Amino acid sequence: MISIANLSKRYGAVNAVQGVTFSCEPGTITGFLGANGAGKSTTLRMLTGLTRPDAGSATIGGKAFTELANPARTVGVMLDTSALHVGRTGRETMRVAAMIAGVPAGRADELLAATGLAGAARRRVGTYSLGMRQRLGLALALLGSPSALILDEPANGLDPEGIAWIRGLLRDHAARGGTVLLSSHLLAEVQATADRLVIIAGGRIVAQGTLRQLLAGTGQNLEEMFLSLTSLTSGGSR
């Protein structure tokens, strides 16, 4: 389970995240939606120990990310695939990560095949397309067979076949009792994939629940509801 309670972060005069509270239950996929600058990235960075919150807490399986003895065994994280080492091959990237996580090297090769990168495993990551880097980032997230996944824009750069593939993978993970937190700007894909939605605007949560709950009585579709909620709050977050 992923739990975020009263999480806040301020950068100078900017309240990037203000009192954010939500949870992601095992066996479900939670879609985390927000416009650029709404506070999604800052929230995910605090959840994964990359940014220290000013207030509040964020836990995965009851522990803060920084308290996990071997994070890769508990949570798979994919935030920014542009940060991958461009001079390493796909296989080198996976095997170094496997060594750090304490998992067999064979697991790295298994995931390269599962994500469709076996044929490109000996190529340097710097030659990969955006879609290939996304697949590699997902393979890294899955390396330790974690129960929870935190993924930021995992469908970026993927073609329709790739998007359908990742949707199936995430649904299978949730069906086996896993917890998925998925950040995306692709509303239609989130609608097709997620069980619950959390919408952030101006650093605050403005709506959360199932799609049916959020749309009940509004006469709107997801896009219309999202735009109406996010347009009420001006930008300024990260």
Annotate the PLM regions:
Residues 208-209:
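ABC ATPase "signature
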Residues 95, 99, 105-120:
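Conserved ABC ATPase "signature" region
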Residues 48:
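Helix-to-loop junction immediately C-terminal to a conserved catalytic motif
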Residues 149-153:
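Catalytic Walker B motif of ABC-type/P-loop ATPase nucleotide-binding domains
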Residues 190-192:
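A short, surface-exposed alpha-helical micro-motif characterized by mixed small hydrophobic
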Residues 24, 56-71:
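Conserved ABC transporter NBD signature motif
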